């Protein structure tokens, strides 16, 4: 009975978010602001996560990092509700709901230190029931080496099907959007988030396991949560971050905050083979 009640409460809260309730001071991310439609040949690792309401509705993004594993944000699937039967995965799709071929999950692994997105460890792994066939249209994104820092000013890309502005949902036919964003140094990002707060500068908001990117014209937003932030390094696309949280979307002095992939590589590789 308790489990059923928790599931009902979780589903109702998810439904409320899908009809765009008023934003909180810090929002888990849902869309692309200041971007444009992606071409069909780009971002072959992009994933749409689905939850069953009247139909399998998109609620978060993700990335294929191995033929049988998807990387996403913990707040999309946890911390309490982890039954894989509740979710489906749609691999690279130009327009949401057009030609769906939904895939079932075998298990969901949420980082054990996750409690809220703002608290960090906002990362989860989804194991597909069956490995996908890798092709030019669908293939994994490479994870970075632990030594990769993605220095401030690096131009990266974030993709998703979320809001295109604060409280402005992506309109039909729901195209995959992309936006180019600059990496923002963590200490600068932390200072920006302390502006107007009374927590004191010695209370960290942006932790080591986080990465900041974006500006007042370009950012991820609500619906993009769990999706990839990718950067091209020496000719190879690497996933630098996972869309996590932020204050509003493309707000002045409030970059988007991402889970820093390199910080969690050891945990990821406990489950995901390093070479597919």
From Swiss-Prot:
Enzyme class: hydrolase
Record-annotated disulphide pairs: 60-76, 156-231, 189-212, 221-249
PROSITE patterns: TRYPSIN_DOM (PS50240), TRYPSIN_HIS (PS00134), TRYPSIN_SER (PS00135)
Sites bearing Phosphotyrosine, chain numbering: 98
Prosegment location in residue numbers: 22-31
Glycosylation sites: 133
Subcellular location field: Secreted
Endpoints of the signal sequence: 1-21
EC code(s) of this entry: 3.4.21.59
Chief localisation class: secreted
Active site: residue positions: 75, 122, 225
CC terms in the record's Gene Ontology section: extracellular region
Highest rank taxon of the organism: Eukaryota
GO BP: inflammatory response; proteolysis
Xref: InterPro entries: Peptidase_S1_PA, Peptidase_S1_PA_chymotrypsin, Peptidase_S1A, Trypsin_dom, TRYPSIN_HIS, TRYPSIN_SER
Entry-linked SMART domains: Tryp_SPc (SM00020)
Tissue expression pattern: During embryogenesis, detected primarily in skin.
Molecular function GO terms recorded: heparin binding; peptidase activity; serine-type endopeptidase activity
The reaction(s) this protein catalyses: Preferential cleavage: Arg-|-Xaa, Lys-|-Xaa, but with more restricted specificity than trypsin
Effect of a null allele: Mutant mice do not exhibit any visible phenotype when maintained in pathogen-free facilities. However, after peritoneal inoculation of Klebsiella pneumoniae, they cannot efficiently fight the infection and show increased lethality.
UniProt domain Peptidase S1: residue ranges: 32-273
Function: Tryptase is the major neutral protease present in mast cells and is secreted upon the coupled activation-degranulation response of this cell type. Plays a role in innate immunity.
Assembly, per entry: Homotetramer. The active tetramer is converted to inactive monomers at neutral and acidic pH in the absence of heparin. Low concentrations of inactive monomers become active monomers at pH 6.0 in the presence of heparin. When the concentration of active monomers is higher, they convert to active monomers and then to active tetramers. These monomers are active and functionally distinct from the tetrameric enzyme. In contrast to the hidden active sites in the tetrameric form, the active site of the monomeric form is accessible for macromolecular proteins and inhibitors, e.g.
Family label: Belongs to the peptidase S1 family. Tryptase subfamily.
Protein's recorded name: Tryptase beta-2
Record gene name: Tpsb2
């Amino acid at each position: 009975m308790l489990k059923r009640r928790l599931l009902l409460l979780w589903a109702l809260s998810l439904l409320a978010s899908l009809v765009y309730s008023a934003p909180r001071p810090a929002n888990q991310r849902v869309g692309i602001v200041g971007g444009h439609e992606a071409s069909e040949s780009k971002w072959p690792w992009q994933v749409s996560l689905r939850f069953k309401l009247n139909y399998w509705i998109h609620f978060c993004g993700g990335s294929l990092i191995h033929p049988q594993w998807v990387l996403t944000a913990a707040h999309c699937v946890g911390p309490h509700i982890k039954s894989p039967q509740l979710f489906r995965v749609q691999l690279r799709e130009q327009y949401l709901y057009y030609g769906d071929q939904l895939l079932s999950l075998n298990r969901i692994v949420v980082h054990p230190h996750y409690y809220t997105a703002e608290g960090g460890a906002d990362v989860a792994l989804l194991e597909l029931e069956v490995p996908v066939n890798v092709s030019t249209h669908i293939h994994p994104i490479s994870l970075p080496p632990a030594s990769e820092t993605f220095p401030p000013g690096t131009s990266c890309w974030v993709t998703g099907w979320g809001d295109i502005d604060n409280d402005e949902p992506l309109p039909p036919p729901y195209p995959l959007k992309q936006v180019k964003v600059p990496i923002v140094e963590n200490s600068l990002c932390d200072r920006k988030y302390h502006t107007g707060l009374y927590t004191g500068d010695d209370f960290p908001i942006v932790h080591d396991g986080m990465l900041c990117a974006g500006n007042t014209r370009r950012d991820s937003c609500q619906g993009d949560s769990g999706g990839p932030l990718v950067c091209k390094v020496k000719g190879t696309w690497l996933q630098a971050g996972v869309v996590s949280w932020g204050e509003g979307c493309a707000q002045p002095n409030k970059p988007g905050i991402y889970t820093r992939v390199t910080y969690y590589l050891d945990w990821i590789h406990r489950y995901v083979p390093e070479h597919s």
